[in-house]
């Protein structure tokens, strides 16, 4: 269960203000959460005013500009810049999304950027994903089969069976959905959350997997699965347009069928 008493250093204070010295054609203020555990200080919100006429169109472009030209200590994850790797997931203007595909022009007023909520912060905009990945490992995300591996071909799958994986395999494990889920906020130590459960259903739905029963038994738990209350935050925030709530519903239906319900 989540700890309800906030530690003293959880209070976010006003930080430094940075402004470009040259005249700006399209000035824009970006407020960024800053936290360094090595400094033993409270988190702060630093303000950066940049010229949008001299940067790219996405939030990640602005962050890179700030890091390269204003404050090299700003810390965040990024890699592909194409919405594929999930590294740059963060909370932007109150919504969990990917910085690399979030247009600056979609946001009115000051831009507010925080790390993904309800995760320990490693530094600045970098969340600790260790627990999330441990939960992913727990569902055994690989084909489990007792049949021998074909000697001269892959494990074949019909087009119809392959289509059952659409809307599942595209998940990039960015954790935007799980960290937008109130049930995961309060029970993240036991509840697997929408991202991991969508991944679990991806293997349950795979016709090449022979361990559907075993997988369903592992998920049939008051906390692992049934903390989902169909709030739908996960589906609303997914940057890939997936529907984790639907996948969770299908898992629940399969378990009910096993019990003749």
From Swiss-Prot:
Residues 1-22 are annotated as: Disordered. Its cofactor is [2Fe-2S] cluster; [3Fe-4S] cluster; [4Fe-4S] cluster. SUPFAM superfamilies: 2Fe-2S ferredoxin-like (SSF54292), alpha-helical ferredoxin (SSF46548). GO terms for molecular function: 2 iron, 2 sulfur cluster binding; 3 iron, 4 sulfur cluster binding; 4 iron, 4 sulfur cluster binding; electron transfer activity; metal ion binding; succinate dehydrogenase (quinone) activity. It holds the Pfam family Fer4_17. Residues 161-191 form the 4Fe-4S ferredoxin-type domain. Residues 28-119 form the 2Fe-2S ferredoxin-type domain. NCBIfam families: dhsB, PRK05950.1. Part of an enzyme complex containing four subunits: a flavoprotein, an iron-sulfur, cytochrome b-556, and a hydrophobic anchor protein. This is Succinate dehydrogenase iron-sulfur subunit.
């Amino acid at each position: 269960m989540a700890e309800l008493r906030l530690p003293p250093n959880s209070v976010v204070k006003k930080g430094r203000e940075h402004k470009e010295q040259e005249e700006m054609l399209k000035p824009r203020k970006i407020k960024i959460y800053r936290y360094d555990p090595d400094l033993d200080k409270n988190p702060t919100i630093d303000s950066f005013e940049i010229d949008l006429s001299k940067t790219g169109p996405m939030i990640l472009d602005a962050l890179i500009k700030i890091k390269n030209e204003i404050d090299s200590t700003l810390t965040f994850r990024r890699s592909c810049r194409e919405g594929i790797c999930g590294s740059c997931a963060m909370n932007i203007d109150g919504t969990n999304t990917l910085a690399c595909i979030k247009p600056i022009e979609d946001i009115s007023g000051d831009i507010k950027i925080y790390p993904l909520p309800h995760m320990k912060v490693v530094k600045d905009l970098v969340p600790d994903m260790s627990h999330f990945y441990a939960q992913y490992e727990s569902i055994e995300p690989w084909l489990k089969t007792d049949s021998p591996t074909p000697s001269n071909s892959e494990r074949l799958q019909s087009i119809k069976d392959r289509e059952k994986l659409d809307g599942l395999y595209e998940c990039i494990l960015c954790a935007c959905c799980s960290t937008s889920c109130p049930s995961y906020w309060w029970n993240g130590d036991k509840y697997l959350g929408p991202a991991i459960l969508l991944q679990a259903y991806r293997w349950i739905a795979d016709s090449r997997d022979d361990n559907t029963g075993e997988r369903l038994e592992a998920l049939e738990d008051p906390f692992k699965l049934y903390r989902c209350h169909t709030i739908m935050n996960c589906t609303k925030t997914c940057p890939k347009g997936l529907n984790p709530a639907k996948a969770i519903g299908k898992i629940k239906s399969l378990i009910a069928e096993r019990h003749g319900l």
